[in-house]
């Protein structure tokens, strides 16, 4: 049990919230069921006492200040696409939704930055930047997450292999601290050596240290040419073993994804389209790499395609299929983008992990993971970012009793996380810890690092009101 005691929201406080955010305060059963859980419902449901739909930094600050003074838990909420229970108000209290803070505030093209409110959807920012001839490189699979949520988990996505993760594109932010104070961290400039980086501490903190309300993000000139390759293999081992060759030959893929045939077939059925071949010249396909390259000209990409084709065919690929039309490229990536959605649609009980391991350990790690499937009553499906070792592994069942499913999954996850740690990996590459992975984080990092994290949390949030029960602070 927590040593911190929280209070219930009173009618008087509700009236004050309504003064702060007129007609945007919901109470009790007025709050939609969607606000009780995120996309991974296996981590439980909890309804906040009050939901406030904020439209400005000042509103967020006023609500948080009132909650801090009265020791009321506060849970920040974006598009609720998380997978670890990070936006579930397990402590009750007040939930602050940031989805109405969805304005793109403007571009500074001379300094290649864009300023936005944190509730802007990733898809909206990507499309708007494209109209400006710019690219916002972070490209997580869930395009309808908020950018603030991406920052809160340091999401990576498909283009991380070349361009890095969300952290690499955050120049500055406006944050409401747990006390209700408003601070601006970072600056438009590209480098700094100015004391502790509170900006970087906030990135990946999952709403436990502050609520991000505005962001200044780095953008880059959009590449002039982009092309994708579908590369089929007879088996997953050969597929993954090819990955280091891309980097040894300086091919610099913009994205490099692996997918198992079963997962691809299920997704194509879900989407009602067939894109990926299942057999070529009598050879059954078992897995695929989906690679994208970008450059300044079509001629440059033609050279890259020729070299990449030689490399992968020599390494065991069955063939190389060029997605040489916009429609085929769109369809190929639509399948990749819908993998999780298809798994969710066909699964009653679902859990996941997104471990990250050194790239030279991917094949061995996935082979080990698949070997564990024989010991369980659930199915194991996987896909992920082959280029940086971030693997998405899902346990799926349609006929197990929930208690037994959770019991078996716990055994499976214990082994998976232990192996990832043994290989020099980490337990989460981009989905975060939330409250679903706290025990695994503690076991992976050990008591010294956890004690430091707890100390950081206490400095920012003395009353422990902000997103309690997540990362390092248990309820």
UniProtKB/Swiss-Prot annotation:
Database matches in InterPro entries: FAD-bd_oxidored_4_C, FAD-bd_PCMH, FAD-bd_PCMH-like_sf, FAD-bd_PCMH_sub2, FAD-linked_Oxase-like_C, FAD-linked_OxidoTrans_Type4, Oxid_FAD_bind_N, Vanillyl_alc_oxidase_C-sub2
Free-text comment on the cofactor: Binds 1 FAD non-covalently per subunit. Binds 1 Zn(2+) ion per subunit.
UniProt cross-references to Pfam families, sorted A to Z: FAD-oxidase_C, FAD_binding_4
Name used for this protein in its record: D-lactate dehydrogenase
Cross-referenced PROSITE patterns: FAD_PCMH
Record organism: Anaerostipes hadrus
Family designation: Belongs to the FAD-binding oxidoreductase/transferase type 4 family.
Catalytic activity: (R)-lactate + A = pyruvate + AH2
Single Gene Ontology MF annotation: (S)-2-hydroxy-acid oxidase activity
E.C. number: 1.1.99.6
FAD-binding PCMH-type domain residues: 43-222
């Amino acid at each position: 049990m927590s040593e911190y005691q929280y209070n219930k929201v009173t009618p008087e406080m509700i009236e004050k919230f309504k003064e702060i955010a007129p007609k945007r305060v919901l109470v009790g059963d007025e709050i939609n069921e969607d606000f009780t859980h995120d996309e991974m419902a296996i981590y439980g449901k909890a309804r906040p006492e009050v939901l406030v739909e904020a439209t400005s930094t000042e509103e967020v600050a006023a609500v948080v200040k009132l909650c801090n003074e009265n020791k009321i838990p506060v849970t920040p909420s974006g598009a609720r696409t998380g997978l670890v229970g990070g936006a579930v108000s397990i402590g009750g209290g007040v939930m602050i939704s940031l989805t109405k803070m969805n304005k793109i505030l403007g571009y500074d093209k001379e300094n290649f930055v864009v300023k936005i409110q944190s509730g802007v959807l990733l898809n909206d920012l990507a499309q708007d930047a494209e109209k400006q001839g710019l690219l916002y490189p972070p490209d997580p699979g869930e395009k309808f997450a908020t950018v603030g949520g991406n920052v809160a988990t340091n999401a990576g996505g498909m283009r991380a292999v070349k361009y890095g993760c969300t952290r690499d594109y955050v120049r500055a932010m406006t944050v409401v601290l747990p006390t209700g104070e408003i601070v601006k961290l970072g600056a438009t400039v590209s480098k700094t050596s100015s004391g502790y980086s509170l900006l970087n501490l906030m990135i990946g903190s999952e709403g436990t240290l502050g609520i991000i309300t505005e962001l200044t993000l780095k953008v880059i000139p959009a590449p002039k040419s982009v092309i994708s390759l579908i590369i089929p293999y007879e088996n997953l081992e050969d597929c993954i073993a090819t990955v280091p060759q891309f980097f040894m030959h300086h091919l610099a893929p913009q994205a490099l994804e692996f997918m198992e045939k079963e997962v691809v077939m299920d997704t194509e059925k879900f989407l009602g389209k067939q894109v990926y071949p299942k057999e070529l010249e009598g050879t059954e396909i078992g897995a695929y790499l989906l690679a994208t390259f970008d450059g300044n000209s079509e001629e440059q990409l033609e050279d890259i395609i020729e070299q990449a084709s030689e490399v992968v065919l020599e390494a065991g690929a069955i063939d190389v299929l060029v997605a040489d039309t916009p429609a085929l490229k769109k369809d190929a990536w639509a399948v990749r983008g819908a993998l999780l959605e298809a798994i969710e649609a066909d699964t009653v009980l679902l859990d996941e992990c997104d471990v990250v391991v050194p790239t030279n350990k991917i094949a061995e790690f996935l082979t080990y993971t698949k070997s564990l499937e024989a010991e369980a009553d659930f199915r194991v499906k996987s896909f992920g970012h082959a280029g940086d070792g971030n693997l998405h592994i899902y346990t799926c069942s349609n006929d197990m009793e929930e208690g037994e499913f959770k019991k078996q999954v716990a055994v499976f996850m214990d082994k998976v996380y232990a192996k990832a740690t043994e290989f020099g990996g980490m337990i989460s590459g981009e989905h975060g810890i939330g409250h679903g992975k706290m025990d695994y984080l503690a076991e992976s990092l050990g008591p010294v690092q956890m004690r430091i994290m707890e100390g950081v949390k206490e400095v920012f949030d003395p009353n422990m009101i902000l997103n309690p029960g997540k990362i390092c602070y248990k309820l």
